[in-house]
């Protein structure tokens, strides 16, 4: 009888030990895989942005504002007053005659540039769809477009009242737009 008790106790100790080892092993694997995914995200690093163009068609006004940001921290602001119904592909660099726009230049800080690049990276801007126009009916709203050029890709996203809907993509666009507007307004 004494021997049977010792066998039962030894079996229980063995069973508890195996259970503890299995739990530890799962915890180590989970911790290791979360470190791996963190490393993957970190190693992706910020986008290698070569130019950011922010375009605003001012709602209800015959005015377009375009800002061109470059890594040398220079910004060119184009205040464009287009004539009549004529349209231009501003993002492709097409502009009306010189007398229909003004250019001003200013600089942003290195922190503002890196903040814009970090936000564009974090919101995965290069994966946003091109048309981000609002689904709601809004009178005289502005249209917002962002074009990001990297060392190996270009993505344009935006539209009528873009970034004001409540879906995840609109929130991602809004976050990028707000960071760019902060850099513009902080000068």
Predicted regions and their residues:
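Short, internal acidic amphipathic alpha-helical interface segments
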Residues: 104, 108-141
């Amino acid at each position: 009888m004494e021997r049977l008790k010792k066998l039962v106790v030894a079996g229980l100790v063995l069973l508890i030990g195996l259970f503890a080892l299995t739990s530890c092993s799962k915890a180590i694997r989970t911790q290791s895989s979360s470190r791996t995914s963190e490393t993957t995200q970190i190693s992706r690093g910020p986008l290698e942005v070569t130019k950011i163009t922010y375009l605003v068609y001012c709602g209800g006004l015959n005015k377009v504002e375009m800002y061109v940001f470059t890594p040398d921290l220079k910004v060119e602001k184009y205040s464009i007053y287009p004539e009549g119904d004529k349209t231009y592909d501003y993002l492709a660099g097409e502009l009306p005659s010189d007398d229909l726009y003004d250019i001003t230049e200013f600089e942003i800080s290195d922190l503002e540039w890196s903040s814009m690049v970090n936000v564009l990276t974090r919101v995965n801007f290069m994966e946003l769809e091109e048309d981000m126009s609002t689904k709601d009916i809004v009178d005289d709203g502005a249209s917002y477009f962002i074009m990001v050029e990297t060392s190996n890709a270009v993505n344009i996203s935006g539209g009528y009242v873009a970034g004001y809907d409540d879906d995840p993509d609109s929130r991602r666009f809004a976050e990028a737009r707000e960071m760019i507007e902060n850099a513009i307004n902080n000068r």
